[in-house]
């Protein structure tokens, strides 16, 4: 991309930190609690060499194992040779299951002024721009734009002036601001791996999550406002399943390559393919992740006889010759064969 991606002055790319984080499991009430520095530790405090595990034409993988407060961290890094992405598997092992301890994976970015976005259902949210104005109300008084950490979907992304970074994630919650003392002013993508909590009920139990925990992440860079953000962030969490030397049916007629349904517009995402509730038609639900009207064509394994625009509960609205989605639209179509 021609621009630096990581700023490793304070944290290394992909290192794990742990902090104390006192809070409840069901509701944080006015604001989500923030961690503090009691018992702070990070994997770079216990530096060990990375060892080459595999080396081939597709990727080279490296592995390291090191202690951290109350656990052991094992990380596997895969650097791909033909495609621009790095995979990281993180295993949190021998966890002592203590209360009020939090672990985060740190990706410090070399972006002084960046916009942070993440996947939400049927779209993406940009921090400080797309939240509902004000606070949620009732007992919640903190402005929505200032609440963090955030619940995320498949990915978390940050865009600088010249390039962007997207991190696919297997966790539900992430942060983007340095939570430690003397915080830095650049963005740090932080999937939260584990946080032990106590029930908000006065007689409730502790949620200490005993056992080993495993996570998977993928990192890539791309141009700002590129559709690769959604494509990479989602596809990395939905890998292809390989079938080796399958038994062939005697009357097999399908070609070696065939797609059940595909679309020709990278800004349109298919979220559901299912049988219609009322008949044997096929239902396809999709959304437009761009801020302009988009036209999309479905390529199917059998030519459809009719495409019908429906509402969300699959009631027919009108037959269409072409599928056009308005900006950020979520639409449902019935396919008849």
List each model region and its residues:
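C-terminal (or distal) subdomains of carbohydrate-active enzymes
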Residues: 1-337
